[in-house]
């Protein structure tokens, strides 16, 4: 067991600084961006880094006016983290295109798994991911 794991187990047993009123309670960590597991390849890190740079610099000037939940930059960050730069980039591009006037609005999460029909040579299929079905 690593040193951090041993300390965490001791804190939970002793009721130390990490303890709360409930037994085995975990502190909820809120993050603006996707915090789940993903493969940290160079292309994903580059794409996620560019989106994070946008969030920290230009997003404040543009304003918080996205029509979707999660916002387009959060969607892009998660799409690239889950599906890679190529698929996530196309998904993000089409999402930003849908965000303008006359586009969709509301809850539009990133799909957890893409079906077999989404291949690298068919980027037009990513256009159908966020469309409302009538």
Curated annotation (Swiss-Prot):
Its main location: membrane. InterPro entries: Membr_insert_effic_factor_YidD. It is found in: Cell inner membrane. The keyword Cell membrane applies. The keyword Cell inner membrane applies. It holds the Pfam family YidD. One of its GO terms (cellular component) is plasma membrane. Keywords: Cell inner membrane, Cell membrane, Membrane. It is a peripheral membrane protein. PANTHER family: MEMBRANE PROTEIN INSERTION EFFICIENCY FACTOR-RELATED. Could be involved in insertion of integral membrane proteins into the membrane. Belongs to the UPF0161 family. HAMAP family: UPF0161_YidD. This is Putative membrane protein insertion efficiency factor.
């Amino acid at each position: 067991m690593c040193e951090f794991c041993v300390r965490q187990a001791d804190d939970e047993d002793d009721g130390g600084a990490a303890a709360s009123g409930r037994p085995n309670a975990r502190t909820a960590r809120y993050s603006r961006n996707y915090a789940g597991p993903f493969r940290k390849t160079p292309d994903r890190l580059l794409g996620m880094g560019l989106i994070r740079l946008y969030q920290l610099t230009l997003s404040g000037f543009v304003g918080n006016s996205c029509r979707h939940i999660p916002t387009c930059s959060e969607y892009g960050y998660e799409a690239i983290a889950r599906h890679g730069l190529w698929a996530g980039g196309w998904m993000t591009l089409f999402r930003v295109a849908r965000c303008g006037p006359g586009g969709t609005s509301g809850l539009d999460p990133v799909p957890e798994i893409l079906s077999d029909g989404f291949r690298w040579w068919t980027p037009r299929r990513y256009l159908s991911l966020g469309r409302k079905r009538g």
